Regions:
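Contiguous beta-strand segments within globular domains
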Residues: 1-21, 25, 45, 108, ...
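Hydrophobic beta-strand positions in extracellular immunoglobulin-like domains
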Residues: 9-11, 50, 95
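Extended low-complexity, serine/threonine- and proline-enriched intrinsically disordered segments
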Residues: 17-36, 82
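Glycine-centered tight-turn motifs at strand-turn-strand junctions
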Residues: 31-69
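Surface-exposed, short loops/turns at beta-strand junctions within beta-sandwich domains
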Residues: 70-74
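Mature extracytoplasmic or organellar-lumen-exposed domains after removal of signal/transit peptides
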Residues: 77, 93, 124-262
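Extended, polar beta-sheet/loop recognition surfaces of beta-rich domains
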Residues: 85-128
């Protein structure tokens, strides 16, 4: 079966003025996709790739192949809106499982739930990683504004070094086409790939790995918080004394805003 849905509509006349687009909503009213609409007179067909946005993952020299693809949308009825300037025309698309699928609805639902769990873990790890690199880079920027032998510059570099070492435990950082380096990021992405390629019930061995990876991720976040809590207040006080910008930690709101339309 195809992974794309074809949305077909007829226009009596070619649309010339004003905006025109197609919006797809799930049963809860969440916008799932916005598609460019054909404007020519007669029958128009628009393809909806029934996948959601790929998960955001921490940057690394290692390509996160499986994370280049988002999950398939769940089975169900989706509302399609053709927005033509100030007019809106509504229809529906029904997404169903392959009738020949050997997997039960319960097994497919568990696969979707597990896949989304790993999707969210990749997104959370991406935020943790960027929080670490943001604080590290800010510390290094401040250190560069001081004499390299200045005590504060040395402490800032040490602070940045601790954060960098922590980051190396969660993300592969070695440069090269094939390094074989595998850290937390790579293990989560790999598991996401396995589950996304099989629409049936995940095996118990696969399911048992998820809480282990989640514990590693939260441990990394706790270490980051501990480093910050033990050093940042004192560093910021000394930065203020030298009339340098203090190090402000990246917030989730700032992070989400940065990637809102990406």
């Amino acid at each position: 079966p195809t992974e794309n849905a074809t949305i077909t509509y007829y226009l009596k006349d070619r649309h010339v003025f004003g905006d025109m687009k197609i919006e797809v909503y799930n049963a809860e009213g969440k916008l799932m996709a916005t598609l460019p609409a054909g404007k020519r007179r007669g029958i128009n067909r628009v393809t909806w790739a029934m996948r959601q946005k790929p998960p955001r993952v921490p940057p690394s020299p290692n390509l996160a192949g499986p994370a280049l693809f988002g999950p398939m949308v769940p089975e169900g009825v989706y509302t399609v809106k053709l927005v033509k300037d100030k007019e809106t025309f509504t229809g529906q698309v029904k997404v169903i499982a392959d009738p020949k699928s050997p997997h039960s609805a319960m097994d497919r639902a568990l696969q979707q739930k597990t896949l989304w769990k790993l999707y969210e873990m990749q997104e959370r790890l991406a935020f943790i990683d960027e929080s670490i690199t943001d604080a590290r880079d800010k510390a290094r920027e401040r250190a560069k504004k001081l004499d390299s032998k200045d005590a504060l510059a040395i402490e800032l570099e040490a602070f940045a070094g601790k954060l960098d070492e922590l980051r190396k435990t969660i993300v592969a950082t070695r440069e090269g086409a094939i390094t074989g380096e595998e850290k937390l990021r790579e293990r989560i992405v790999e598991l996401y790939g396995w589950i996304s390629q099989y629409s049936g019930r995940p095996t118990e061995s696969v399911l048992s790995r998820i809480p282990v990876l989640e514990k590693e991720m939260e441990s990394a976040n706790s270490q980051y918080q501990s480093i910050v809590a033990s050093q940042l207040v004192a560093l910021n006080a000394r930065l203020a004394e030298k009339k340098l910008d203090q190090i402000k930690l990246l917030t989730k709101e700032e992070y989400d805003k940065k990637y809102k339309d990406k």
